[in-house]
């Protein structure tokens, strides 16, 4: 049986968890094996900017941060299960990558 690795990436961990729960329900309904969701390391993008735009005065900095959360889900690539995975409602800020392995 083929395996499918589904990688979920996004900035909102709650929405990623919702998509993971939908994948779990699909696996339960179709009776295929599911492994995960495995949390991968969170990537932090930090951008420091000067508070004063003119360059005069005290050098104070603001730090803006964007966190990118990732989850990995493994599922058997059964035809019925994969059709239902393709129909999952995915929010705008969550991206999905599906990789099939033999």
UniProtKB/Swiss-Prot annotation:
UniProt KW Disulfide bond keyword: no
Keywords of this entry: Ribonucleoprotein, Ribosomal protein
GO cellular component: small ribosomal subunit
Pfam families to which the protein is assigned, alphabetical: Ribosomal_S10
Gene Ontology terms, MF aspect: structural constituent of ribosome; tRNA binding
Keyword Transferase among record annotations: no
Coiled-coil region: none
InterPro entries hit by this protein: Ribosomal_uS10, Ribosomal_uS10_CS, Ribosomal_uS10_dom, Ribosomal_uS10_dom_sf, Ribosomal_uS10_euk/arc
Family to which this protein belongs: Belongs to the universal ribosomal protein uS10 family.
NCBIfam families assigned: uS10_euk_arch
Its job: Involved in the binding of tRNA to the ribosomes.
Protein name per Swiss-Prot or TrEMBL: Small ribosomal subunit protein uS10
Organism, as annotated: Methanosphaera stadtmanae (strain ATCC 43021 / DSM 3091 / JCM 11832 / MCB-3)
């Amino acid at each position: 049986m083929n395996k499918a690795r589904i990688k979920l990436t996004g900035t909102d961990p709650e929405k990623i968890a919702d998509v993971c729960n939908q994948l779990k329900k699909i696996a339960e309904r179709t009776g295929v094996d599911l492994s995960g969701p495995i949390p991968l390391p969170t990537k932090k993008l930090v951008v420091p900017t000067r508070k004063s735009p003119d360059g005069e005065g005290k050098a104070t900095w603001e730090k803006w941060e964007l966190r990118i959360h990732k989850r990995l889900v493994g599922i058997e690539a059964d035809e019925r299960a994969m059709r239902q995975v393709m129909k999952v409602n995915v929010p705008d800020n969550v991206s999905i990558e599906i990789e099939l392995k033999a």
